[in-house]
Amino acid sequence: MSTSATADAPADAPRTTTGLGDRPAGLARTGAGRSVGLLVAVAVLVLAVGLSLVVGSKPVPLGTVWDALTGYDGSGDHVIVRDLRLPRTIVGLLVGTALGVSGALIQAMTRNPLADPGILGVNAGAGFAVVLAVAFLGLTDISSFIWFAFAGAVAATVAVYAVGSQGRGGATPVRLTLAGVALAAVLGGISQGITLLDPQAFDRMRFWGAGSLAGRTTEMAGTIAPFVAAGLVIALLVARPLNAVALGDDLASSLGAHVGRTRVLVGVAVTLLCGAATAAAGPIGFVGLMVPHVARWTVGPDQRWILLYSAVLAPVLLLVSDVVGRVVVAPGELQVGIVTAFIGAPVLIALVRRSKASGL
């Protein structure tokens, strides 16, 4: 991968579009402004974590939350905080970060502002594997879904790359997109057919399929954390070459970027991140689509900053959506995937209505 200053030059181009219209750059145009904005985003994330621990069908005072974290005594409120809300908050942080970064990567690689992590068939592959495990192996525990879902996500991505690499030119963004959409349609249809024929599988899948953080444990967080960490490391490594790839394959190659290698690494990172997120929480839409746009609108087209902002803002959206889902129908709750869809759908409509919206 190229690390030359030339390959990084597009990051500072003053008239580069952001994908949200014909904007010259982000709101924060200087390094200092971007750093301050990132600190503000981190502060908002801390607030979202606090809300996730405090707010629910049974509100817990902030002081009690602190006592539960520092001096656990087994009381009812302490059990709620330590055994229920803290694990789902940690999983929400990991899943949100994974979805945000994978969304930014896939939009950069495909140069498509409407792309999301599921475009490579990751969600469909994970869902298909879980359906098979539930219908034919009788799995009932959510924690047992993780490895099947992750294996399905990896298998789907490999299949998409195998199909998209055929023919002259190799794995172009258009071919990968078409292969991913086709595979997702096929796997989704088969999954629906199996669940309709097996009522027990349908009953077990309906909550996981909607995307939820309820019932997640610290063990599940520990299971997906290494995959998320590996995906984030790869994302940071490809951030600089992606600035060149965003200009097009030919120009990126002339600037010294290794387009093919960058594309493969992006695919690996997206599979690790989105696969881990889907395995832990089920398919959650719109987070990986919407957050990279907000990041790009804020900081401009530099992928290094977009990835950092996406890693912070995406868990904010996910945790806030989870909190909203807990309180709107209390004492029950809405799955976080449903809430993010309600938030993300208007944003998607606004993006479609922008005739000047373009790639990176």
Predicted segments, located by residue:
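Alpha-helical transmembrane segments in inner-membrane proteins
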Residues: 2-360
